């Protein structure tokens, strides 16, 4: 198990015949092993067909639904995809839309309408596909209102065009082997190399 905010958390996984996760059981509790709370998630899959590079038809299983069962009840979320396999809707039950996602012609996420968080997020990208900004608005599925928050991303314009050098106006410095060394006044350390 792992300790999260003073609580012991452990997970058990079940798999189907295709070795996909079919269920997860999370046991959450204090160090009293006799009374942990259990949250389970069960997954169902549906096949998504698309045309591969050689014009062959490829079949990819995508998550159709996730049912979460807790001591106080259960909830099922259903996933809908576009022709590229991008999630377009997450629904609670059959009809209540929880999240709606919009993509550009390159398959980059450009908008998320999230009714649970009460927010709509809009992303912009540069020509290389790097995120330039994420703007936050009050939740809407229609015309956007006033911007509530903007997060910006800055990149190296020299040799390595997709190297993130700033996040939300704060510089990111890298060490000699490419690991971030400082950000927002904090020193970052790396182990294992």
What is each residue range found by the language model?
Residues 1-193:
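Acidic/glycine-rich beta-solenoid
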């Amino acid at each position: 198990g792992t300790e999260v905010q003073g609580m012991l958390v452990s997970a058990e996984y079940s798999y189907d015949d295709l070795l996909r996760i079919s269920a997860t059981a999370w046991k959450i509790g204090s160090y009293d092993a006799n009374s942990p709370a259990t949250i389970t998630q069960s997954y169902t899959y549906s096949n998504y067909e698309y045309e591969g590079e050689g014009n062959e038809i490829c079949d990819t299983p995508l998550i159709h639904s996730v049912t979460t069962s807790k001591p106080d009840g259960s909830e099922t979320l259903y996933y809908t995809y576009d022709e590229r396999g991008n999630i377009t809707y997450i629904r609670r039950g059959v009809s209540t839309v929880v999240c709606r996602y919009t993509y550009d012609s390159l398959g980059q996420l450009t908008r998320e309408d999230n009714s649970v968080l009460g927010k709509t997020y809009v992303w912009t990208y540069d020509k290389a596909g790097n995120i330039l900004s994420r703007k936050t608005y009050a939740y809407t599925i229609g015309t956007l209102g006033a911007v509530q928050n903007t997060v910006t991303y800055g990149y190296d314009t020299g040799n390595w065009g997709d190297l993130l050098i700033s996040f939300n106006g704060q510089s990111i410095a890298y060490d000699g082997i490419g690991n971030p060394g400082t950000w927002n006044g904090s020193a970052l350390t790396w182990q294992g190399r």
